[in-house]
Swiss-Prot record:
The gene is yhaM. PANTHER family: UPF0597 PROTEIN YHAM. Coiled coil: none annotated. GO terms for biological process: L-cysteine catabolic process to pyruvate. It comes from Salmonella paratyphi C (strain RKS4594). GO terms for molecular function: L-cysteine desulfhydrase activity. Belongs to the UPF0597 family. This is UPF0597 protein YhaM. It comes from the Bacteria.
Length: 436
């Protein structure tokens, strides 16, 4: 009904959000390996007795210290075992959503028996790479995921190759809805958000539903570092003000607490990350409630936040040494500024101030401490919005911030793409030394 009102660019924007904003149960790096393992197990008729897995250094970094939902355990081995014994290979990032208590117990027993090995893929030119090879008697199956958390590129068994993805990545990039982001701007994204029919973007309200539920769970339970619930107690003790800034901080932190602590609730992810999805969603929800926004205004603000976050992250490697909660929070700054002011200049100033503030925050792997970085990023976003509302921002005379927001974004992303590669290697070396 509304398709006739939507031009091709807007359709690409909607498809890009639908492609990058998806439900995900558990941190997406171990979940990627769980999916590879589940897909491999689906190729065998017998019971899987052993698992060998190989992952890229970046995937190892993000899988070493994070809790796998429903298991109470951290790390890639339990993710691989549970993927085999309780995973649904057709469920993508929700591969473990139906894993039973028996499957969890069996997975732990498989680990205890020493039947799961996870190794670094060396050499590895792919930032995101996971391969699982599973064995049942004399039979085996192997599944490889490359480039994206759910992008299966090869399925092979002892009987031969079952599936291989054609190597046409450059052509796909040209036709992919994400490809259009290389040739657009924040101004075009804002024009889309202001004018697109509500029914075409109503689906983004699911992000508020899922990530709002995670936030509530984080405040109820003692998940992860329980930053959200701890700060809520400090409000009750009079050590922290009960105001909008604090509500943004507490509710966003709580969602990440639950996410990283292993709550069995899905997050609505952004750019392959639950924490990025939380960061792009919850601050906007809190401000929307404060200003009394209806569903349509909330949907437009969330669409601006998520699409801006995708637009910025598309200029980054899929995984890098740069904490992408910071770039997701730039999207949140845009969404919050839009709810209060709506002007492009305010949005641009807020993002520029974010780049002048939290740039360079490192990603040292997925863990409970991600909630600290999520809370810092959300607070910085709101601070940047408050400054922008008074026409104050970090200017192009300072640091890596340029005189226009598009160049500021490009400057930030060039750091992650080039200069921070050695940083990433050093982080992985430090983390690997701790594991021994």
């Amino acid at each position: 009904m509304f398709e006739s009102k939507i031009n091709p660019l807007w359709q690409s924007f909607i498809l890009a959000v639908q492609e990058e904003v998806k439900p995900a149960l558990g941190c997406t790096e171990p979940i990627s390996l769980a999916l590879a393992a589940a897909a491999a197990a689906a190729e065998l008729d017998g019971t899987v007795e052993r698992i060998d897995a190989w992952v890229s250094p970046n995937l190892m970094k993000n899988g070493m210290g994070v809790t796998v939902p429903g298991t109470g355990m951290v790390g890639l081995p339990i993710a691989a075992a549970l993927g085999v014994l309780g995973g649904d290979a057709k469920a993508g990032l929700e591969v473990l959503k139906d894993a039973s208590a028996k499957a969890v117990a069996d997975a732990k027993a498989m680990l205890a028996a020493g039947h799961v090995a996870v190794m670094l893929q060396e050499p590895c030119n792919d930032i995101l790479f996971s391969r699982a090879k599973v064995y049942s008697g004399d039979s085996w199956a192997c599944v490889t995921i490359v480039g994206d958390h759910t992008n299966i590129v090869r399925i092979e068994t002892d009987k031969g190759v079952v599936f291989t993805q054609a190597d046409n990545a450059q052509e796909e990039e040209k036709t992919s809805p994400l490809g259009v982001l290389s040739h657009t701007s924040l101004e075009e994204i804002l024009a889309f958000v202001n004018a697109v029919p509500f029914d075409a973007i109503r689906f983004i309200l699911d992000a508020a539903r899922l990530n709002g539920a995670l936030s509530q769970e984080g405040l109820r339970g003692s998940w992860g570092l329980h930053i959200g619930s701890t700060l809520a107690k400090q409000c009750d003790r009079g050590l922290l003000a009960k105001d909008l800034s604090t509500a943004i901080l507490i509710r966003t932190s709580a969602a990440s607490d639950a996410r990283m602590g292993g709550a069995t609730l899905p997050a609505m992810s952004n750019s392959g990350s639950g924490n990025q999805g939380i960061t792009a969603t919850v601050p906007v929800m809190v401000v929307a409630e404060h200003v009394g926004a209806d569903d349509e205004r909330l949907a437009r603000a969330l669409m601006l936040s998520h699409l801006s976050a995708i637009y910025i992250h598309h200029q980054l490697p899929r995984l890098s040494a740069l904490c992408a909660a910071t770039t997701a929070a730039m999207g949140a700054a845009a969404g919050m500024a839009w709810l209060i002011d709506g002007r492009y200049d305010t949005i641009a100033m807020a993002i520029s101030s974010m780049i002048g503030d939290v740039s360079g925050m490192i990603c040292d792997g997925a863990s409970n401490s991600c909630a600290m970085k999520v809370s810092t990023s959300a607070s910085a976003a709101w601070k940047a919005v408050l400054m922008a509302l008074d026409d104050t921002a970090v200017t192009g005379n300072e640091g890596i911030v340029a005189h226009n927001v598009e160049q500021s974004i490009a400057n930030l992303c060039s750091l992650a793409c080039r200069s921070m590669q050695q940083t990433d290697k050093q982080i992985i070396e430090i983390m690997a030394s701790k594991a021994h």
